[in-house]
């Protein structure tokens, strides 16, 4: 029967196929010509038939008709009645008399004959809408077969049947523990991964230990490559989970993790084709299983569900909830008495042991009952709680009584009475748990619970509940606690008769097994306190190595076990490090712990599910023993009730008449024209599955170092309109936003494919090959290898500090910042190393040893910047360093000075001594100002200084503003004596006779003027004309400027000097022989009316000269008449030519009277 073609066909499909086959024979009988005529016409409506019935009906139809039927859409194309309709033996007379009429009684179609209809016991097939094809990308060739692995030995009939139905239906599999539910799941996952190209299969389990256990089983049975599988938990970072969903196809995880990944968009619900649910009896209420399936159905209906459990439920309603929530359409259930699994179930010897309370327990119960009697009497006297015995209190009974009273009489009592009753119920509910611990688990857990109750109340002081203090201060309660404390000090005190029997049972079991045996035992306890007490007692016994196995939650007296610790504990138990495992409810479900020969249930549970799960831990591979330790009375009754309930539920599920299955939610994934055939073979296990024993958990690597996951993805069902619409469209039928015009398709690379050129046009000619060989492929003579030249990044450093000229595009903000930065870095270097080349060559000119002339007076060397002090006298070692800082004035200062004078003079050729200084001045002249454009810098500016008002004393000096061009002006006078003019080299002061004092002279200089001097009201024109005639230069118009790009302009914009040949006079012979001065162009400016109105005091030249001599600042000397000033500089050695500068003191001096003197240092040696 295993290989029979029709062994998997339900009985109702067989009956339907027989009916259709008989109908076809009757319809073709020659005696019924009318039916023959009607059967030749196409039917008005096509009816789908089941797959099982189609396999039987097909032989009665021609091969062409069968092929057309298999590929046609149901209810979409009319076909022959033999293949798509359901004819019956006799047509219904009622159906023949029906005809469609109009509203006025006329017949719509007189000649139309109704299509033959068949009477079916399955009306849902006719009511179902047309099936939609799956959206998953399938592999047609692989789908023609489905693989049944033969790796585990002979085929088990029940496993083969369940796998066959689970591939095509949403199936609930209920098998006793240890009968291969994992093998069934692995086989179905293997086939769906084969059938689809990119779809994913997900295995969900309630806990991580269960999920981890299924990973190894599926990889070793089904042969799915380990590289395509992954284990995801809540501890996995979201970034790694997102990457795993994009690359893997088989997932093992908890339902909570799957729900989070679906809701956050890491997992695509449309990509899941198979969902395997372990411990499916949990799929009730708001559990994560229910939420996951609901979420998937919102976006996709083309996925298969396989639910695995040992006990579907404890009631009819619970089983129906599982069927509805998971969309189950088929149930495969087996019991231990089923024929096809009986040979695979090992015998289990169940021993039930009942106990009576010990004397110590009776004494404790009596004292505790007296302590609780006042509270119970208070409730019973008001007809709120009808129990009289305090030791029969239960948490559920008290909660139900309180809710009934609050819904009834409690609504009409005053608030004081209501609060008092609620407080009494709360205290009794907390103490009812202690009563349960005393009756079923022992005195020690009972004492620990009450000690915690007492400690919590004592910590509150006098602010706690009065009713709790009443219980704690009761004489019977205190006596009971003192008595228990005395018992616990006794060595070997057990506290419950179950503990004594448990120790004896386990010791006898290991003694009978013999030393070195591989036998193990599991003890199940409901509460953690009781489990820890059992471990403490068992470890004192010989041959017993016990350990506890609890959940992850922390209690008030102990910590939970992390998932890693749980897995390690199970591995140690399998390896033999521990031979007794004391577990709570976490060890009841699904754990394949290994060869367990003895199960001890320390307490009984009223739930048949938990009872069967506990018993299923043994008897998997060999016969096992089960010992039930029950207390007489209530606990024994609960066990019997659970046992009867389990047998009743198994019988009802097998019948199937009490449940409604959801065929509408079990969509077809395999196309109807494809009929997969079984292929029984040994599946090859990839080598990678056995090489790495670790779990396939994702690990963070260097290539996956993203710290943030991608943005949340919002999944939308098919056909949903997304985006925004106008507010005016609301309420309008079919209102949609206007679609933008379609863009032309982007050009493809193939559109620009050029024609293939001729071979001669792309190959090198003979001459080109010789040139290639001579110039590029051959090494030059005398070279052993090809030279590689490195770019010298230190060449031309000064070009980086200047903003070069542009034509069409201006320099950007970043370019100007970089230039300014390089200029600042250049200024920060030491002067001694500034001109040293980086490649080892140094300047041998010894320019540092050239002596510098003495500096100007401190009163004239005030700097213009805010906060800077006067320039001090420098030593010889510092002269070279400070020379450059004072040798290059600002560009705008030079511009303002040039504009104020209005005349430029021709300078001599610069000396070789100042070559380095000039390069720095060029850099300073183009210094970038962030607030001024290049164009604005090139324009001349007319700055006018404001003098101080007259007053009796020296007024407070105003602070200079940033960027003000007048900040370098002096206090009382304007000196232009630094203009370099041709002199005869003498030092008698005759070259300063043209320093004419005009009307702009202030009172500070008049007090030192001789009485016979020229009047200060001299006309400005005369002064300027005389100055021009004596200097022998023409006055230049103010608007005749030189170009900014002139190499000689080291201080910015300047006037075009007039050549010597055009001057009225001629320079002295000494000046003609000298080279032009290197860094300054003297200018002249005629006096104006504005410059004669100055009111600042100008100190006398003789007074300043005498002061300088007293201070010893230099050997310089100032002599001459009040109208002229002569400045002489002497060298250190006393030799060398003197420089004399002559400057008018008329209108030009008054206009720039607030300007400081610009210090220009020069060498005393004028000779080449």
UniProtKB/Swiss-Prot annotation:
Residue span, Helicase C-terminal domain: 506-665
Compositionally biased spans, kind Basic residues: 701-714, 941-959
UniProt feature, compositional bias: Polar residues: 24-38, 59-68, 89-104, 895-907, 1001-1030
Listed Gene3D superfamilies: hef helicase domain (1.20.1320.20), P-loop containing nucleotide triphosphate hydrolases (3.40.50.300)
Keywords for the protein's UniProt record, in alphabetical order: ATP-binding, DNA damage, DNA repair, DNA-binding, Helicase, Hydrolase, Nucleotide-binding, Nucleus
Motif (DEAH box): 278-281
Biased composition (Low complexity): 71-88
Domain called Helicase ATP-binding: residue spans: 162-330
Enzyme class, spelled out: hydrolase
A cellular component annotation (GO) from this entry: nucleus
GO biological process: double-strand break repair via synthesis-dependent strand annealing; interstrand cross-link repair
E.C. designation(s): 3.6.4.12
Listed GO MF terms: 3'-5' DNA helicase activity; ATP binding; ATP hydrolysis activity; four-way junction DNA binding; four-way junction helicase activity
Compositional bias per record (Acidic residues), positions renumbered to this chain: 920-936, 985-996
One Pfam family linked to the record: Helicase_C
Region Disordered: start-end pairs: 24-132, 690-717, 830-1168
Catalyses which reaction(s): ATP + H2O = ADP + phosphate + H(+)
Principal location listed in the UniProt entry: nucleus
Known partners and oligomeric status: Interacts with the MHF histone-fold complex to form the FANCM-MHF complex.
Cited function: ATP-dependent DNA helicase involved in DNA damage repair by homologous recombination and in genome maintenance. Capable of unwinding D-loops. Plays a role in limiting crossover recombinants during mitotic DNA double-strand break (DSB) repair. Component of a FANCM-MHF complex which promotes gene conversion at blocked replication forks, probably by reversal of the stalled fork.
Recorded family membership: Belongs to the DEAD box helicase family. DEAH subfamily. FANCM sub-subfamily.
Protein name as it appears in the record: ATP-dependent DNA helicase mph1
